[in-house]
Structures are given as structure tokens and as C-alpha cells.
Amino acid sequence: MLSFPILIIALFNSTVYSADTSGVNAAEKEAEIVLYTVMSGDNNRVMIEAFQKKYPGVTVKSWWGSTESMLNRVLTEERSGALKADVIFSGGSEMQVFKKRGLLQKYISAEAEAIPENFRDPEGYWTNVHPLSMVTAYNTDQVKPQDAPQTYQDLLKPQWKGKMSMERLEYDWFATLQRVWGREKAIAYCKKLATQNIRFDSGHTKIATMVAAGDIPIGINMYEYRIASLKKKGAKIDWVALEPVVAILEVIAIPSNAAHPNAAKLFVDFMLSVDGQNLIRGFGRIPGRRGIEPLDKDIAKIKPIPTDVATIYRVGLDVFGKEYREIFGLQ
């Protein structure tokens, strides 16, 4: 794989962006954007450097946090009347909360045509940059491949009781299972899973690292690119895709009160463009754009179901969260 600096240089000759000259000029007059993002530090840095190399007249100021801290920060700033972001890159479920509160403006990038329709907001408030397919990870020293769970029902076997970990805030997975299986089956399953003495923690990366280190044999709902990355580095970890594979949407949007809207649109265009999506591919992630396959061929075989953001928008993420916490005994 090309190193990121070489990849960046190579990409700039490949694409004409959807922003026309007048749009670029308007963005350069604004001179900067404030980006709120959940993308990991190194990946975020490379993306920003690539954008600023293409558009040296626009400076990106970035704040990074988890999806939970993103939700808290944006809503806290909203209450104080001082939302500072020009661009928000976060989970689709959290973005639905922002949309419902009137915090986003419509922007349909010309690049969005290349993103599958069911991975875009039908009203044009946000667009998926890349999905995060959730898989089950296991420590290869503690679990033989033939013994690893192959189905959701396998997670209920007595042999895994007290030996699995899961993120505390899997509300979108919980909501999507209800859409795919039906509410009755999904609730019944989660109640059975709750009897398996699951160790709940905060952060998918943290849990993946714990599995790789042998601190816990199995991690449920891990991000596939993170497991593949650890495996590539020699960690004692592998993964299995349990059907249905739920994909968390990592989406981009512009706040309704963005101080630098033209520069924000330019950044959105860039992340959705061929160049931006090839960077996503270079990070080992799944590009959201049609025609650009993941580097990892096994990951490319996954056919994920996008998070049920429509129902989350209608019902409310907090409603799913409350029921999820009650089932799993979380505070």
C-alpha cells in the first residue's frame, strides 16, 4: 500500500471536484472552517492535510471526540447559543438528533450521486462518508477459528458466559436488529444475551485492544477495519461477520448556523470525492462511494445493512437508549 504522503500527491491529479471556481473563491474568502469529527487522529490529520494541499487558501481547525462526546459537545453549545462547527463528521444516529433539533442545513453535494441512496439523508441534510461494519472479534490464542461464534445464537452458548465484551452505547445496532428481525424477536434475543454476563465498556477501539491483548476472549460489534488493522500488525485477533451485519454510518453535514458555509461545502465535496474516498480506502476503511472497493478483500465481501436511522429519527435515539440500558442493566 502506498504511504499516505505519496498517496496524497498521487490523488490530486485524479479528480475534478464538484466545487466550481466561484465556490472555491467564496470558500477562500472565508479562509477557514471549524471541523468537529469522530475520525481517529492520524486519519483526520491526513484528510485535513490533503484538503489544505488542494485548497491552500482554506485552513481547517479541528476538534476530535467520540460519538458520545460529540453529541454532548454539540448539544451543550446549542443550549448556550454558540455552536462553533462549520462541518460535523459523526455517526448517523447522532446526526439524526442534530437534524431533529434543527441544527443542520441542507446541502446535496454533486459528489453525493456516487453514494448509494440508502446511505444518504433523503432530505439532503447529511451524506455517508464511510460505513463501519460491525463484526465479532476473538482472540486467536483463546478461541480456535472453528469454535468462534458464527451466528448471533452462538453468542448465547454457555461456554461464552462472562467471556464477552460490548460497547455501552450500541443503540443503533439495537434499533436496526428490531427492523431486521422484528421487535419481538430482537427484544427476546437481547434479553437472552443480557444473561451472558457481558462486560460493558466505553470505546470500540478499547475493547478491540483488550481482545487482542487477551484480556477478554470475544468482542461483540467491533469495527471491522480496526480488527483487520490489528491483525495485519500481528495481533492475536480475528473476526467473524454475524448475519445480519449492521453498518454504523459515519456521515458528514453542515450546521445551519455555519460561519463559513462555502468553505464547509468545499470540505464536504472533498470527503465525498474520488480523492477523499481513496484516502478513506487507504486508511483501511470501507469507502462510501460506489466503485471504490476496500483494500481488504474479506471486508469487501461483507454486505452490511445500514443503521435504521429513519426509525431512530422518528422514535428518538434516547428512546432506544433507555430500553437498551434497561435490558442490559446499565445505568
At which residue positions do the language-model features occur?
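Short amphipathic alpha-helical coupling segments at ligand-binding clamshell hinges
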Residues: 47, 185, 189-192, 250, ...
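Short beta-strand->loop
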Residues: 104-111, 124-127, 229-246, 255-257, ...
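A ligand-binding cleft/hinge motif common to bilobed small-molecule-binding domains
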Residues: 93-97, 217-237
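Periplasmic-binding protein-like
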Residues: 117, 132, 160-169, 190-194, 198-201, 271-293, ...
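A bilobed periplasmic-binding-protein/Venus flytrap-type ligand-binding module shared by bacterial periplasmic
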Residues: 135-142, 178-180, 248-260, 279-280
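Extracellular/periplasmic bilobal clamshell ligand-binding domains
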Residues: 294-331
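Extracytoplasmic ligand-binding site segments that recognize negatively charged/polar headgroups
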Residues: 21, 34-48, 60-78, 83-215
